Swiss-Prot record:
Family: Belongs to the major facilitator superfamily.
InterPro entries per UniProt: MFS, MFS_Domain-Containing_Protein, MFS_trans_sf, SPX_dom, SPXM_SPX_plant
SPX domain sequence ranges: 2-145
PANTHER family assigned to the protein according to its UniProt record, in alphabetical order: INNER MEMBRANE TRANSPORT PROTEIN YAJR, SPX DOMAIN-CONTAINING PROTEIN
Native species: Arabidopsis thaliana
Gene Ontology BP, a term: transmembrane phosphate ion transport from cytosol to vacuole
Transmembrane segments: 252-272, 283-303, 320-340, 342-361, 380-400, 416-436, 523-543, 557-577, 586-606, 614-634, 679-699
Localisation: Membrane
Protein name: SPX domain-containing membrane protein At4g11810
UniProt topology in membrane: Multi-pass membrane protein
Record-annotated disulphide pairs: none
Keyword Membrane: yes
């Protein structure tokens, strides 16, 4: 793979060559620091100071050139504004056409400047990561924090493209006013809903979107999905080349089929929750065996996530076909277990359903095949489909209140979820076979691991100690064997990449070795919230029947209402709260709220009431939803870039952590059932409380490294 140094040289704008980051010089300087430290000619503080000074100089050069170009663009726009004013008094169609072309020419030059900024931003991120990798020290966070927060920050100029918004606005507004050659002047401010059909403005908007990493609802929802992305090579291409490269891979109907698969699988997961205890008792088992029935699907998913993730390296269509067939038969077995009076058949059916979990394929399709400009929306759609399926599953179960037989086959509230889902998967299979298009793959396509584009520009990789002084007390230079492993050839600037430093992890052990303490804590938090949510949902029918005598319909309504909170809560957090507070602050506050919800759920001395259960359940569930979104947002930033590709990627690790939590939670419910239903609630909540307290302590310990 051609590395960044050569790409920068090939794709830089020739007349602006001297204003780009001198990546080769910076890289060579990093290489020289090693021997100098070994012989004692330089100490650690001097290295950090010297490297910071060099990088400051490079950023200043870039920032000042940006300001100069902004000034030139602004001057041209001012002259065009004067020309525009004269045409308002005496409209001339030919002059209006020329004026539009003049604005488009400015827009094209603005695109060049945005591409210049993009290349330099990538270069700065890469050289910071190279310094961290070579010396085993997380310098990135210290540098970014001290420079970005300064009132006269030049780093902000580069990464936040300060001032360019006014230029973009001027071009967009004037082209919008001139879009009608009849002389009708329409303002984007007065009528913002009016579409502007101009390819230049569309290209500018896409370029700005690539550079902008501000938090909003779609961004928050996209990170909630933890779609691991690897598009740095693509980002460094001009927009027209990006579109050409993406063409042939994206197919709207195929994306829709992946989202439908996500939705149906979540419906399949939760449709049995309200009736699992009743089904278990009808087969002669205890009500608490519902934990095993519900958890069997999660057990199988532990294995299916791995082989589906590996299978998606070669195909997307075949795994989805296999998933649909397995889920069809799984639901068929689940429904037939009633007439065969077989608990074993019931569990086998649920295991089959778990073996059909293709969520890894759904995630992978979005990260690999959906164009950058709509990937955030697609990722948010993945989360929304999951949330909608989670809400619709129990609601659908509540509607299946009937009991009849056709020949010797029973259709009642216990078996109908299986029959309905079997039909749904059969119809989906037909739709899939007709409409899905396998994406085009490049010859010898290699999924290499680079910096994830979902990573916030300002975050870099997390500093494990969050303190520059603490870092200075550690050995700055790693063993020569390790540094040589990551070194790149500087002879001709071609920068051959080290295979080991870029290739994806090839096993769980290799993936685990890439996990920093910050990432481990985030996975622990994910485990905790999934455990707490599974306890709440899976035992709801048993607990509410025992304490309140709720019917299956009442349980369905309760679970449906819980599911409906997912999207509104994420909307509030993604659009408002995350703009007022840091992610790590929201993370810690959400953990505390989950802990409060768990504590309030305990049955201690006083009679257990419906308001106590419902209020504590909503506090726990809503807080866990907020926590999940923020947790995955942070996880996508602090996780190694090598985990953005391959079979054992970050998405798989988080899925496995959550699935293991669900398996243990469901097993806990069944085991606690041996102590009697009166003890079930408190016994299952106690592990949740312990894990939650541990996760809060771990978060406090790594708080300074969560950026």
């Amino acid at each position: 793979m051609v590395a960044f140094g050569k790409k920068l040289k090939e794709r830089s704008i020739e007349e602006w060559q001297e204003y780009y980051i001198n990546y080769k010089l910076m890289k060579k300087k990093v290489k020289q620091y090693g021997p100098q430290i070994e012989v004692g000619s330089l100490d650690r503080r001097h290295v950090l100071k010297d490297f910071s000074r060099m990088l400051d100089h490079q950023i200043e050069k870039i920032a000042l050139f940006m300001l100069e170009q902004q000034g030139l663009l602004s001057s041209r726009l001012q002259k065009l504004r004067e020309w525009h004013d004269t045409l308002q008094d005496e409209p001339d169609l030919s002059q209006i056409a020329k004026l539009r072309e003049a604005y488009r020419a400015v827009g094209q030059d603005l695109l060049k400047l945005l591409f210049f900024i993009d290349m330099n931003a990538i270069g700065i991120r890469k050289i910071l990561k190279k310094f961290d990798k070579r010396f085993g020290y997380r310098f990135t966070n210290y540098y970014v924090k001290t420079r970005a927060d300064h009132p006269y920050s030049q780093l902000q100029q580069v990464f936040r493209h300060v001032g360019l918004g006014a230029v973009v606005g001027a071009i967009s507004r004037n082209l919008h006013e001139l879009q009608n050659n009849e002389g009708s002047y329409l303002s984007i401010y007065d009528q913002p809903v009016l579409p502007l059909q101009d390819p230049v403005v569309d290209s500018i908007k896409n370029a700005v979107d690539r550079l902008t990493h501000s938090t909003n609802f779609l961004n928050f929802m996209a990170q909630h999905a933890l779609i691991m992305q690897d598009d740095e090579d693509l980002l460094m291409l001009p927009p027209d080349e990006q579109a050409e490269k993406e063409e042939g891979r994206y197919h709207f109907m195929s994306l829709l089929l992946n989202l439908a698969n996500t939705f149906l699988y979540m419906v399949n997961t939760y449709i049995i929750v309200p009736t699992a205890d009743d089904y278990s008792m009808s087969l002669g088992a205890a009500a608490t065996v519902c934990g095993v029935v519900i958890g069997a699907m999660a057990v199988a998913q532990l294995f299916s996530s791995v082989y589906f993730s590996a299978w998606s390296n070669k195909s997307y269509f075949k795994p989805l076909i296999f998933s649909s067939i397995v889920l069809f038969f799984g639901n068929l077995l689940y429904a037939l277990a009633y007439d065969f009076n077989s608990l074993a058949l019931l569990l086998i059916g649920r295991l089959f359903c778990g073996f059909g979990s293709a969520r890894a394929v759904n995630r992978r399709y979005i990260s690999d095949c959906v164009p950058l400009k709509i990937r955030m929306q697609a990722s948010a759609g993945f989360v929304s489909a999951s949330a909608l399926g989670m809400a619709c599953g129990p609601a659908l179960a509540g509607l299946l209140q009937t009991d009849f037989k056709i020949k010797n086959v029973t259709f009642n509230q216990d078996t109908l979820p299986g029959w309905v889902m079997a039909v749904a998967w059969l119809l989906y299979l037909v739709w899939l076979a007709i409409s899905f298009r396998e994406p085009a793959r490049e010859p010898e396509e290699i999924h290499t691991s680079q910096e994830s584009t979902s990573e916030q520009i300002f975050c870099g990789e997390a500093d494990q100690d969050g303190n520059i002084e603490k870092g200075l007390k550690k050995p700055l230079l790693l063993a020569s064997e390790e540094t040589e492993h990551d070194e790149e050839d500087d002879g001709d600037g071609s920068e051959e990449s080290s295979d080991d430093s870029r290739k994806p992890a090839n096993s769980f052990v290799a993936a685990y070795k890439l996990l920093t303490p910050s990432v481990k804590v985030q996975l622990l938090i994910y485990f905790m919230l999934k455990y707490a949510m599974e306890i709440l949902l899976s035992e709801s029918s048993v607990v509410t029947t025992y304490y309140f005598g709720w019917s299956m319909s009442s349980v369905s309504i309760f679970l449906f209402c819980l599911g409906l909170t997912v999207l509104p809560v994420n909307l509030v957090v993604g659009s408002y709260i995350s703009n007022m507070f840091e992610d790590r602050q929201i993370l810690l506050a959400s953990e505390i709220m989950v802990c409060i919800g768990i504590v309030l759920s305990f049955h201690v001395v006083i009679p257990y009431t419906v308001p106590q259960y419902v209020i504590s359940g909503f506090i726990m569930f809503v807080s866990a939803e907020v926590l999940e979104g923020v947790n995955l947002s942070l996880l996508s930033r602090v996780m190694s870039s090598r985990l953005s590709r391959g079979t054992y990627n970050g998405g798989l690790l988080s899925t496995e952590a959550g699935t293991i939590a669900r398996v243990i939670a469901d097993a806990t419910i069944t085991l606690a059932g041996f102590l009697g239903q009166s003890m079930l609630l408190n016994v299952t909540l106690l592990p949740s409380l312990i894990i939650c307290v541990l996760s809060i302590l771990a978060t406090c310990y790594t708080y300074n490294s969560l950026y």
